[in-house]
Amino acid sequence: MSEKRLTREVTLKLNYYKSKVDKEAGVYLGGVVDPKYIDELEFNIDDDYEFDMESEEFKKNGMYALEISGSNRALKELGKFLINIAMFKTEDDEYHEHIETIKNGNGQPSVNITVRKK
């Protein structure tokens, strides 16, 4: 039995700050508006594991696992933020945005995310 794939179209309003560029001075103002509801997101970074059939135990596989969790509205805002960055037109070859003080698994604000557009 195969799963049936469904398609759902969504409409987004993308929000940006007005750009101002002075290449000679290295000034690039403007960019993507910060996502809302950051306080409802958690990013957990931990060792990754895989199940070993012989020992019937989970063992570290040498990689890291990133778990992102949050409320529906926080995850939607994070997705919209990433699409905003992808769609943002800039002359800045090193354009990036920061999301700061995202909570980790213990609820403390300790994860800062930098998203770079290449």
Question: Where are the regions that the model predicts?
Answer:
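Positively charged, low-complexity terminal tracts
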Residues: 1-118
